[in-house]
């Protein structure tokens, strides 16, 4: 893998535990329930998920076999930076998908503590470091849940409505039977992925 700015990329091929051949086509009922419960619990403990981050991993040259490790590296970099600059903690849930057009990607819902300064360029540098490739335009998309950083405080009804929509979007790839049991408004297959399909912080 090509070095970037003289630095070794964080993703390295080979080695025990770096790859997995297990695949999945849907989120299982338990996985979807866990993501939904984690989003609700984050709100209860004062760590509302306020940012929706989408990373087009395949577009950035990150193979499906390396996707889980890349997501973990990104979350670790963000967590450590948040701790260093605010002495606070993040919370998150994430779900991977594989689209026919954009390929492998991940949706991450984040809580960032008050006072943390979000900078897109910093995130781009991390993505470059993880992938070992120059940032490709369109790899990162980010929006605020509830439209503003403090929507959960200033307009809680709007925030909760938007949060429900975004979490529903995150779990739309649940298998049809489970989706019906959860009464999801949107159920749509989101492609086959290799390795872990979703995750959450230990909040």
Regions found by a protein language model. Give the residues of each.
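Right-hand nucleic-acid polymerase module
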Residues: 1-104, 112-203
